């Protein structure tokens, strides 16, 4: 999912139609803590025969930070569009089952009504940013709810402060980094006062610093305990420490797992891997190392856990012997080969900016060289 349709890009901020209330009242009592309920939800896009997802049922309450996983094509992004009414109201698709947002049936309430209860942040923040300053951008939604000016400004300030952008409120969004623009999109959702936040791959187009910026903002929201968050994400290295629950869809878009992070990502990692579901890098590495004879109980999720587990055990004998043989063969091959590329003391400037400084490297036959660095 890269972006919503143009007509729906800002539909969460559309003013209510005549006869609608700007702030519908959610169900109270026991239902109050439940922000979202999906009951056997299936979605069939226009022109398609099969529903994807086919049957999804789960709930989200305040304090839940839910990671929604599934193989490519299982309908995760499609499902996110049903959580705030874009399906069926703006995106042509048939919906079966029931989506309830704060007790309201999403099929019979408009996107404008639902926007006060659920905000959505897409993969590409530029699809949602339309004004000339950060403050104007965050005020756009509350203004379209016809709130008093003082309330609009109060909401905008609170939202910008929560994502660390208040001091830059007069700047053009174009001056922000990718991570900054995504934080701005999150602030726009927060300013609507929505207790539920849905994020569809919010870090897909970001560098490591941008990813850190987004999750720093989300960590603060999750710590408050007053929001519910649904996260669709492929970068599980960043997401795993942040979430407290995992829901998994199979290839047909049917829920096959719903539980705590350890129960799902550790306890069912091999099953998820066979299904084509993304896993944390350290968990994938541990699965491969386990095939080579290493023992992991439990499976690691983070690099620190993987490192600690490896430090506690010697390498299996077969691995040590294979490594020694490979090392000897590599040394023989490289020593007999020639240099293909040699760089010495390279400095490069673009206009007044020095982008490379005194770089030296050598590439020989048999080398597999990776060059990494900050953007």
List the predicted regions and their residue ranges.
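ABC ATPase C-loop
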Residues: 189-190
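Conserved ABC ATPase signature
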Residues: 172-176, 180
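Conserved ABC ATPase "signature" region
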Residues: 150-168
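ABC ATPase NBD coupling module
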Residues: 104-119, 265-266
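Conserved ABC transporter NBD signature motif
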Residues: 92-104
